[in-house]
Amino acid sequence: MLMLMLAAVATVVRAQTVCRFRTVRTGKVFANPVTLEGDLLFYAFSNTVVVKNVCKTDIAVYLGQRVFITKNRFEASILPLTIPKSMEVKMPSITSAHFVSDAMILFVIDGKVYSYNFIEDIWRTVNGITEPVSHISGDPCCFEGYFCLELSNNLFAYFRGGQMPGTNIYFSNNGGFSFELLNSDRMSHLKGLLGGIFHFHSLSQVGILLVENNLGTFHYLEYPLNHSTGVPFLYESPLEVIIKPQQRGFLILWNQKTLLVSSNSGQIVEAMQLMEEGNINDLNVEHAKLTIHSIASNTYELAFLVEQDQLYYGSQSYMGNYIIKLSNQQFWSEEASVHFWDVGMLEVLTPVSDPYFPAFDFKKCLVNVQLALMDQSLQLEPCNVEFLESTMEDRMFIIDMNSKLKLSALMVPRKGMNPTPLVMVSNPHALGFKANLTQFGNMYDGNSKFKLDIELQQQQHWGNSELNFTASIKHEAISSITVDIADKTLSCVDLKPLSTLISVGCDLTKKVIVQNKISACAMGILDPVLLQKNYSYTIEKEAYNPTSYSGEAQDDLIVFYQYKELGCPRLVYYDKPWKPVVELWKDGTLEEIMNAEYVILELNGIVTYSYSLTAATAHCRSQPQNWSIFKEDAEKPSLWNRETYVSCHEDNQDNPLLWPNVEYQILGGRTDNKIIFGQRNGIYTFYLTVVDPYYSYCDLNTIFSVYVYGALPVAEFRPMTSILLMVTVTLFTMWLAYAIPKQLRTERGRRLTGFCFQIFKYCPGICTCAWLRGKMRRGLRSRRVKDQPEKIPQIGKKPDIKK
């Protein structure tokens, strides 16, 4: 009997005690004369909270009656945080904190935003905010790459409780180094008290929480949700809004008397489901006479400590939000706080002051949630899944336009159980999928193995959703994908859902290359060795227009050939219409020969080429764009791109087809437009950019060179004119060769010859050269003598009558 009583007591003790306290105390062997300088910071509210750096979980800040920043999970004694007197803070109370990097945190102190580099111990006032604010919101992304960094840099600063419209909202796209005033035109129709503004990256939306008549409602600014709102919910007093990490769309809205959650970025806000004694009911914190003192969360878990010395633990998923009372162990104090260091590892943290040292120690109690939930008194069913794994964890995937992505997961259910796997996306407006579950073998114990195959692509390409449901295909989007078990029990703590982030946007491994199968070097026209030695060539002033100013060129242009970027030029015959063959490469592999619409521009201003099609022959229905529209920004050819391109093959009342004979300067796509080079040999350097908005989200562009050959020098006269002139001159010359000798034998010819002789004799000024004049005289004399008859008497002498 005694043994049974001892066993019962032991069971009760185990149910109540879920962890053991330990105290962290370091660096206090010898007396430390350190004194605190500046103003001691404190949290403006009566509760406590631990804000973690979600990308580097060893870093966190504790907010309470004192403020502490740790870089090692509070595993050392820490001095309370102070702000220098030079910052001139009237009331050093913190209302919001947000980590922006591994070394910097933003604080809202007394209505102003300050940045603190806790590695260098440098404080700075953030520029751009001119009116008091109370909160900073952001959603950090922890994957590597520029895309994720851009998400993390987007922040809002706002005053909670301000009247809309009329309250200034500030935004930052540089990680909080500076802020700008947000344009309020898009929010002019919103009315109520501002409860917060947030970047919901998992839904590709900006959400605004407005409160009116004790009802809170989320409004969205981006299509297709900009004309709809979330479901209203009861909002009687200000609520703190926590965006849970990893862009899953999970929210927590809470204060000391309220706890609400959302699994879809605020579209539906609901209460947690309390599991107690086998029953499940909505948790009403106020009716349960509880006062939440501190709350903790990670991606799929949450926990909170109440002033009534009770610790609650719950899970948050797309299928349900359940919570259970974990322990009645005495945790609570005014300084106590809770936070997660890992999945299923919950820590109760309490700063402890030291009368002899300024640094605070920390009393810690680490709760193994999985072990605590195994207590039979909680009456929880065991986890119905033994194994759930996939390679998609801890990776971010990219789906470009017209691309697909295939993922898979492996599931092993608990023996005798038949769980249902569930695939969910956070942004169904942009991302769609289909999934297939197949059995593919057994474990050693005879348990079945299942494989889940998932195929994802843009929602627009599935063709099974309404037009007003899908997001704009021209704009990039983000969504998470999660694989979970639909009927998973609360005890599956260690079996977290499989989830990752999908970027419906530009795949940075893509690039375009102009095919170069026949080059000028391969044909022996150019020498690649010479091209690499600062090779230069001349562009005649008649062949180019300056790119730096408008007007005609005044001098020839000398261009140095960039062999490293251009390689050997492609060889093109001048008299043959030509179109570049553009290849699309992805991650070093040739994907396809591109057939999208693109444009080219000669970078040195050469204008001796044209296009084979006009607006009419290209079957345009509106006036086509051309480079003259962007001529004011000739130094920025990238301004004509997929975002600024407007197709002429669609009706456009604002730009009707008025000039059908203008050049159609777009290559590729539905037309067979080609380049026609003028009668000029030489090198052309082109910039090529893809303008088709439905081909890729990337700004695909490249530069390439061609060498045009085979052009003869340009004739100064028209060919027909030259031929007529040549024939006329030939015939006239032949007539003169016949007519002149004949005329010289006549009396008129002799008189003409004598007349010419007299002119050359008495007009020496006609030829100033004596030698040449003598030659001409002798020539004329010999010609005259030769042409005369043999018996003509000599001039100036009488004839010999005797003979």
UniProtKB/Swiss-Prot annotation:
All ranges on the Cytoplasmic side of the membrane: 743-803
Membrane-related topology note: Single-pass type I membrane protein
A GO BP annotation: spermatogenesis
Function: Auxiliary component of the CatSper complex, a complex involved in sperm cell hyperactivation. Sperm cell hyperactivation is needed for sperm motility which is essential late in the preparation of sperm for fertilization. Required for CATSPER1 stability before intraflagellar transport and/or incorporation of the CatSper complex channel into the flagellar membrane.
Ranges of the Extracellular topological domain: 16-720
Pfam families (UniProt xref): Beta-prop_CATSPERD, CATSPERD-E_C, Ig-like_CATSPERD
Listed InterPro entries: CATSPERD/E, CATSPERD/E_C, CATSPERD_b-prop, Ig-like_CATSPERD
Protein name: Cation channel sperm-associated auxiliary subunit delta
Region (Disordered): 782-803
Gene for this chain: Catsperd
Glycosylation sites: 226, 418, 436, 468, 534, 545, 626
Assembly behavior: Component of the CatSper complex or CatSpermasome composed of the core pore-forming members CATSPER1, CATSPER2, CATSPER3 and CATSPER4 as well as auxiliary members CATSPERB, CATSPERG, CATSPERD, CATSPERE, CATSPERZ, C2CD6/CATSPERT, SLCO6C1, TMEM249, TMEM262 and EFCAB9. HSPA1 may be an additional auxiliary complex member. The core complex members CATSPER1, CATSPER2, CATSPER3 and CATSPER4 form a heterotetrameric channel.
Membership in a protein family: Belongs to the CATSPERD family.
Intrachain disulfide bonds: 19-365, 55-142, 141-148, 383-492, 506-698, 521-568, 620-648
Lineage: Eukaryota, Metazoa, Chordata, Craniata, Vertebrata
Residues spanning the signal sequence: 1-15
Cellular component GO terms, alphabetical: CatSper complex; sperm principal piece
